């Protein structure tokens, strides 16, 4: 069963009039984030460049939750545009504007217009680790193999 939590959200002045994040299907994990750039001034993201796109939103997550900002697969597949620091983490105590750091890996400039869906946000529970220093770690079947050691 899906757990429902309450997240407080506020539009900043430049985000007024834009829809709040919403799930596009009944079983979607991510809510769409929308660009809050001026109507008459879209951002043009040149190939190989990145830009911080405003969403015009601030949120207050419950304690022990985070929001992950992830790419939209359609933008990546069609235009080579993705979230540079994916997943970006929004901590429960952050109260600033949600920004989406997009990069254009494509070969053509990409225009980011007001109201365009630019990323998705997944709300997830947080576990906090307590580290214990030890002299040696227990053995495992994998050992120290990394960077492709379990396959091709």
Curated annotation (Swiss-Prot):
Binding residues annotated for substrate, in chain numbering: 72-74, 85, 89-91
GO biological process, one term: dUTP catabolic process
Catalytic reaction equation(s): dUTP + H2O = dUMP + diphosphate + H(+)
Name of one Pfam family that matches: dUTPase
Disulfide-bond pairs as recorded: none
Known cofactor(s): Mg(2+)
GO molecular function: dUTP diphosphatase activity; magnesium ion binding
Enzyme Commission number(s) of this protein: 3.6.1.23
InterPro entries in the record: dUTPase (IPR008181), dUTPase-like (IPR029054), dUTPase-like_sf (IPR036157), dUTPase_trimeric (IPR033704)
Keyword Hydrolase attributed: yes
Keywords: Hydrolase, Magnesium, Metal-binding, Nucleotide metabolism
Involved pathway(s): Pyrimidine metabolism; dUMP biosynthesis; dUMP from dCTP (dUTP route): step 2/2
Function recorded in the entry: This enzyme is involved in nucleotide metabolism: it produces dUMP, the immediate precursor of thymidine nucleotides and it decreases the intracellular concentration of dUTP so that uracil cannot be incorporated into DNA.
NCBIfam families from the UniProt entry: dut, PRK00601.1
Similarity comment: family membership: Belongs to the dUTPase family.
Name this protein carries in UniProt: Deoxyuridine 5'-triphosphate nucleotidohydrolase
Species per Swiss-Prot/TrEMBL record: Rhodopseudomonas palustris (strain TIE-1)
Species lineage: Bacteria, Pseudomonadati, Pseudomonadota, Alphaproteobacteria, Hyphomicrobiales
Originating gene: dut
